[in-house]
């Protein structure tokens, strides 16, 4: 046995003994446990129906991830919950907050964008919206990407011709703008449409966003007939074009086969890595798709990755009524109960059958997941090569996982700003970028003192590591 193997074996025994010593006090209740390393950094968070029985399993024969993890455990914490579903929710919240090394992590976890119908103005408008407050106004979505929102907004603008300008721009207009000239706005700002007629357009938008496309088409057909009988063929033609556009949207919706709001989740594996493709359908309309590449350890299987993804995804995102999966999870009823507690929604989780009208959609999702994963692995290989070159160039002892690059800028000492760019195994990580407004210039740091500015930026950055140890850099370039 080598010295390294002996030390690892001793650490495993030490970790097991620590857990064994705590077992007597651990209750036989549901809850969440946290394993911490020598620096009191949380390295794993788990949930259990019975905390004592679950922790006892770590004192027996272990393999893979668990062996390595137990060798690093110096502290153990736990929290009791009133049910297993509550433990599942708490586990997801803590994983999202602390990002432990040995848990499956959802990296790209931005909130989904919506289309919002603003109702706080005399002439409402459709806008992009990203946030959690879905109370004021009427919302359509969520969408998988901002691009999908922009495409849909453009289509709705062509059909309903609601204003798209800001409130100040609207109130300052004396004559119609270009949007009116290209037939994408009804120009309420200059009275080209009456308030009554504009409100009717708004009501049509509400009907459409509620998924009642067919009833809206029927209503418009009646109006078109009425205009034709009055020999008002210009208005009848406008409504005819609107019906055609809505019919096209309806045709696209019918190809999905989904009546209820649905989230379709497909997972695929290649060379030990996973890609999860999420397709969103709301009110019968496709709202786009997005690939995710969760971080995980080598011995975590498809079901475990899928379970972790579901709970982390829906921590702050509202689920659809139906969640259709490409692969099964161990306890779908537990997840259904947890989502009910979290969002107050009755959710149905099931594996999509291999035959049927919607089976083809799952096959498309799986194929897209495979293509996205292949591209992801190619990009990862390029990034790894770049990191290896950095390691060689600067004679680093290990491959860096997080590189931070700093610089600052100012205009003759004024408007000083510092910037941090972050790169790692997945390339440049834009969500980790930071800007620092230099505060010290108010305390005699001015006149273009770059060293003083960098000192302030680095002091502020490093002071945050106490609360964010998982963001510790392996290498800094200044």
Regions found by a protein language model. Name each.
Residues 2-478:
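Conserved catalytic/ligand-binding micro-motifs in nucleotide and anionic cofactor chemistry
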């Amino acid at each position: 046995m080598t010295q390294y193997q002996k030390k690892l074996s001793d650490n495993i025994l030490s970790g097991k003994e620590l857990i064994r010593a705590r077992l007597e006090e651990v209750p036989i209740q549901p809850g969440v446990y946290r394993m911490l390393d020598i620096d009191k950094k949380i390295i794993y968070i788990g949930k259990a129906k019975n905390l004592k029985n679950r922790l006892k399993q770590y004192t027996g024969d272990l393999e893979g991830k668990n062996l390595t993890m137990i060798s690093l455990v110096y502290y153990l914490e736990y929290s009791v919950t009133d049910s297993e579903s509550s433990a599942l929710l708490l586990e997801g919240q803590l994983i999202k907050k602390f990002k432990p090394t040995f848990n499956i992590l959802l990296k790209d976890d931005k909130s989904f964008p919506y289309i919002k119908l603003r109702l706080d103005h005399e002439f409402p408008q459709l806008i992009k919206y990203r946030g959690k407050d879905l109370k004021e106004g009427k919302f359509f979505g969520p969408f998988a990407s901002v691009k999908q929102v922009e495409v849909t907004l453009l289509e709705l603008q062509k059909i309903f011709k609601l204003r798209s300008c800001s409130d100040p721009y609207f109130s300052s207009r004396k004559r119609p703008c270009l949007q009116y000239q290209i037939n994408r706005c009804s120009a309420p700002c200059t009275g080209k449409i009456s308030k009554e007629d504009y409100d009717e357009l708004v009501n049509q938008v509400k009907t459409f966003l509620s998924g009642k496309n067919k009833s809206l088409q029927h209503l418009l057909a009646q109006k078109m007939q009425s205009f034709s009988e009055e020999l008002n063929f210009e208005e009848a033609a406008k409504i005819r074009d609107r019906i055609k556009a809505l019919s096209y949207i309806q045709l696209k919706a019918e190809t999905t086969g989904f009546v209820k709001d649905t989230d379709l989740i497909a997972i695929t594996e290649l060379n030990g890595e996973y890609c999860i493709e999420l397709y969103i359908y709301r009110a019968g309309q496709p709202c786009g798709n997005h690939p995710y590449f969760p971080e995980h350890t080598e011995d975590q299987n498809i079901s475990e990755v899928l379970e972790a993804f579901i709970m982390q995804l829906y921590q702050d995102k509202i689920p659809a009524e139906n969640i259709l999966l490409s692969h099964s999870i161990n306890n779908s009823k537990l997840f259904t109960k947890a989502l009910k507690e979290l969002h107050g929604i009755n959710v149905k989780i099931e594996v999509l059958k291999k035959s049927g009208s919607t089976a083809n959609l799952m096959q498309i999702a799986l194929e897209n997941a495979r293509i996205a994963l292949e591209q992801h692995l190619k990009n990862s290989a390029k990034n790894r090569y770049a990191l290896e070159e950095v390691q060689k160039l600067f004679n680093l002892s290990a491959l860096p996982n997080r590189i931070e690059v700093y610089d600052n800028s100012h205009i003759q000492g004024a408007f000083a700003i510092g910037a941090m760019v972050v790169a790692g195994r997945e390339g440049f990580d834009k969500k980790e970028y930071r800007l620092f407004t230099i505060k010290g210039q108010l305390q005699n740091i001015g006149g273009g003192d770059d060293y003083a500015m960098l000192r302030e930026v680095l002091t502020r950055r490093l002071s945050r590591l106490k609360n964010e140890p998982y963001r510790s850099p392996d290498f800094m370039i200044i």
